[in-house]
Amino acid sequence: IVNPDGAKVINGGGLILIPGIIEAHTHIAVPIPKNKINETDQAYITALSLKVAKGILMRGWTTIRDMGGPSQGIAKAIDDGHAVGPRIYPSAKFISQTSGHGDFRDYNEDHPSMGAISNYYQKQSSIIADGPAEVLRAVRESLRLGASQIKVMAGGGISSDYDPIDSVQYTKEEMRAAVTAAEQWNTYVAVHAYTDDAVRNALEAGVKVIEHGHLINKDTLRLIKRKKAYLSTQ
């Protein structure tokens, strides 16, 4: 190999050089279990997130797609040269229906629309929105905060306490509202969904990316292809 003039030669010590790796699904701003979020100072959580960001870069991941949580500030700190980490595409707040996969209130906490101020939601991790109008507002709020794409909870999950994993979350009308608001910003909606019904409901509303999808069948996979959508299986 002939080195071009002015090229910087780095002694790799016999190691293999590869291009930077892209991580398709992370939650870098949620570095501790969700049940610890409420009782942990936000500055401490951010410090842990910055440590995680540096570790990700040092292990070879140069770009990450962050799929929910207040990572937009971490992304800006890295972009502005104040912290070390990968390029981050943030989703900002998870968007969830009441009793959806992103409704992490304690059992006896009142609903935010009833005047309650949840400690979890003060930390900007997620937002509860019901009905097309509230969903539109929630998407626009995440975009205002700096989201590159929008993350909506479209079905049940493992880490949430009050929704069955086989539940379908959001009506098509609500999901279409999210898609419309995202498309007006020249971006897209990605959804958390495991099951056929949840994935199909999202696809029919115009969602472009399915996150997880571990319980879907071949017919649903074919529908993803027909809709020219994408499946991120992490």
What is each of the regions a protein language model found here?
Residues 127, 136-152, 158:
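Alpha/beta enzyme core
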Residues 34-47, 114-137, 188-190:
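Active-site mouth loops of central-metabolism enzymes
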Residues 15-80, 98-108, 173, 205:
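Metal-associated gating/positioning segment near the N- to mid-region
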Residues 78-82, 143, 222-228:
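Acidic (Asp/Glu)-rich catalytic clusters
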Residues 30-33, 84-125:
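Metal-cofactor-binding active-site regions of metalloenzymes
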Residues 1-18, 37:
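Histidine-rich, glycine-flanked metal-binding segment
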Residues 42, 98, 152-234:
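Active-site core of metal-dependent hydrolases
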Residues 48-74, 85-94, 147-160, 188, ...:
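Divalent metal-dependent hydrolysis catalytic cores, especially in the metallo-beta-lactamase
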